[in-house]
Regions:
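DNA major-groove recognition helix of helix-turn-helix/homeodomain DNA-binding modules
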Residues: 60-78
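Short, charged recognition helix plus adjacent turn
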Residues: 4-8, 76-87
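Short basic helix-loop element that most often maps to the first helix and adjoining turn
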Residues: 22-41, 66
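Recognition helix of helix-turn-helix/homeodomain-like DNA-binding domains
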Residues: 43-57
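A short, Lys/Arg-rich alpha-helix, primarily the initiator
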Residues: 6-30
Length: 87
């Protein structure tokens, strides 16, 4: 079964899927891309991009990471206690 992403950890707080959806939408629109443009670059379906942007809480994490990579970002894990990034 695919791992489902419910939250992403960021700094001292939590980035929810609603927050992630807003980030994806903002980065996409800043680039002047349609949902289809982003989907093509990430090799995903337009409906998946729409699900992410609508805040659907059960999107597959690997595919969400692919969207961020297509937007020029990487997702990293950081220890909240030490600030150390896991590589």
């Amino acid at each position: 079964a695919a791992v489902r992403l419910h939250v992403l950890i960021r700094g001292p707080g939590v980035l929810t899927m609603r927050d992630a959806s807003a980030v994806v939408r903002e980065l996409r629109t800043q680039r002047g891309w349609t949902q289809q443009d982003l989907a093509t670059r990430a090799r995903l379906s337009r409906s998946f991009v729409a699900d992410v942007e609508s805040g659907k809480p059960t999107v597959e994490s690997a595919k969400l990471f692919d969207l961020f990579q297509a937007l020029g970002y990487e997702v990293v894990l950081r220890d909240l206690a030490t600030g150390q990034v896991l590589r």
